[in-house]
Amino acid sequence: RRDWARFADLHPAFRMGDDREVGCYAATIDFVRGTLPAGGVQEVVNHWQALRDADDGCTYAASELFSARQLPALEVWRKARLSAEANRQRATRDAVAIAAPDVSNLVADLYANPAKFLGSRVAAPTRQRQELVVLALIRLAAKDPDNAAALLESKWGVQLSHEERHWTWGVIGKQAALRLSPSAMEHFDKVAKDSDLSDDLLGWKVRAALRAGDWKAVHR
């Protein structure tokens, strides 16, 4: 019900500090009151991106912070990417609806048939369209990483930002590594900046490097 006054009264007595959604509600109250501490926005990001399923608390907090220009669009899109990789369509749509509400209806299309979604488009001229392409490539990689890699290499890579391209190669590399494919490290080698990857993707890059005997990549 978002009864913030009642929540503020009860929250100090709440002992389960590991509830991410409650933490986001508390951050929302602090933000509304103007008492959100330094690092509060990052805490919301950490809670939100760690949740696999769609939620109200962190999604609402992220929406409020984004509307107030306190939350970078990149973090919202990264939440959408993480949700797409986890096959959580509602959570993906919720994130897209924050950053780009006018294209959130397209999430259903890229989930239903990512190859068709990518094949029906010639270009991605805007940030929103680029990110939808990234989401579609992530969904395609879950089913067919080789096809996703081919499309990224031949068509979409030049249209994406460096960060978008690196993240997508990381996801494709992870999916290849999950299948014990020898091509996994080839995909990860296309990531020129490791800081563009999530901790999870970095972990999979190390696993792929170990399997390939690429000790230089392991120590990087």
Model regions and ranges:
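Alpha-helical solenoid repeat scaffolds
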Residues: 1-220
